[in-house]
Amino acid sequence: MAEKPLRPLAEGELSIDQVKEQLVELGKKRGVLTYAEITEKLAPYDQDSDQMDEFFEYLGEQGVEILNDNEEVPSLQQVEKEEEEFDLNDLSVPPGVKINDPVRMYLKEIGRVPLLTAEEEIELATRIEQGDEEAKRRLAEANLRLVVSIAKRYVGRGMLFLDLIQEGNMGLIKAVEKFDYNKGFKFSTYATWWIRQAITRAIADQARTIRIPVHMVETINKLIRVQRQLLQDLGREPSPEEVAEEMDLTPEKVREILKIAQEPVSLETPIGEEDDSHLGDFIEDQDALAPSDAAAYELLKEQLEDVLDTLTDREENVLRLRFGLDDGRTRTLEEVGKVFGVTRERIRQIEAKALRKLRHPSRSKRLKDFLE
């Protein structure tokens, strides 16, 4: 599954495979792991990005959920932090968000589902423990409004409102599967944690034009926090070396992270006060000819056309096909022969005769300047 560490193992130290197996077992037992837990365990083994990505994919295949933002698996205290009042009767759309008819129908439909009382929640949770799938469905449907209320707070972060709702619904389903009413908190409070986790993870995973692995997004977020703190402490932008020292990384690694963190810029970005120019207008085309070369090329084409006009139609067309003068694709003698319905030897003779004519001083002198 993974390579052994390059450094020698100390006495009693676990191998990289043993550490990964422990993480997999823990993840299967709890259902979730955090990025902080994984990176802390694997940090001494010099795993590169590809190896880390491979392990994250393997965890996903094993059904292990990986959480963002260094959050621990939600305890009672952490879930209580999510205690927040949401107006579940407010299914209005956030300002500036355009929605189509299917979304309106969805919001109208979930508004018809009655909310649950605390007693009904406990009853459904008890039935879910006994494997009642209908109870799962009812508990989820009754909390779809909660997802919409939470999703509204993440509008404008790079994902469509409907996509935010969809991701939040995935978190709601996870909450339904893991809810334990015996721990003493309401389902809506517990579900809020999972819904936020699902939405923030989706934003990190999908909102960028160029996808960045979620564990790298976590590293970027940490780097940004360190940069802001150093900016406050130093009164200026920190250098990569200062950030590296604070994060216990090499300056080269910090520069690599900063490069990855850059957001792409559209070539259509308006430039100037009048917005009449775009960024793409100021980027050099490395493949374009210089103006002088382009002018010379056009003159050569004109002179070449004039010279070819002095040949017979058949001679001119043979040269055009043989040297790809019209479309840039050269043809073999056999291909040209099929076009004219003659043998390849006959085409060779026509070509040789046409080239001899072009070499005559009366014609070649018109092209001589372009060959020097």
UniProtKB/Swiss-Prot annotation:
Keywords: Cytoplasm, DNA-binding, Sigma factor, Transcription, Transcription regulation. PROSITE patterns: SIGMA70_1 (PS00715), SIGMA70_2 (PS00716). One of its GO terms (molecular function) is DNA binding. Sigma factors are initiation factors that promote the attachment of RNA polymerase to specific initiation sites and are then released. This sigma factor is the primary sigma factor during exponential growth. Residues 307-360 are annotated as: Sigma-70 factor domain-4. A motif (Interaction with polymerase core subunit RpoC) lies at residues 163-166. The keyword rRNA-binding does not apply. Residues 139-209 are annotated as: Sigma-70 factor domain-2. InterPro entries: RNA_pol_sigma-70_dom, RNA_pol_sigma70, RNA_pol_sigma70_r1_2, RNA_pol_sigma70_r2, RNA_pol_sigma70_r3, RNA_pol_sigma70_r4, RNA_pol_sigma_70_r1_1, RNA_pol_sigma_70_r1_1_sf. The lineage of its organism: Bacteria, Bacillati, Bacillota, Bacilli, Bacillales. GO terms for cellular component: cytoplasm. HAMAP family: Sigma70_RpoD_SigA. Belongs to the sigma-70 factor family. RpoD/SigA subfamily. It comes from Halalkalibacterium halodurans (strain ATCC BAA-125 / DSM 18197 / FERM 7344 / JCM 9153 / C-125). It holds the Pfam family Sigma70_r2. Interacts transiently with the RNA polymerase catalytic core. Its main location: cytoplasm. It is found in: Cytoplasm. Residues 333-352 bind DNA. GO terms for biological process: DNA-templated transcription initiation. This is RNA polymerase sigma factor SigA. Residues 218-294 are annotated as: Sigma-70 factor domain-3. Coiled coil: none annotated.
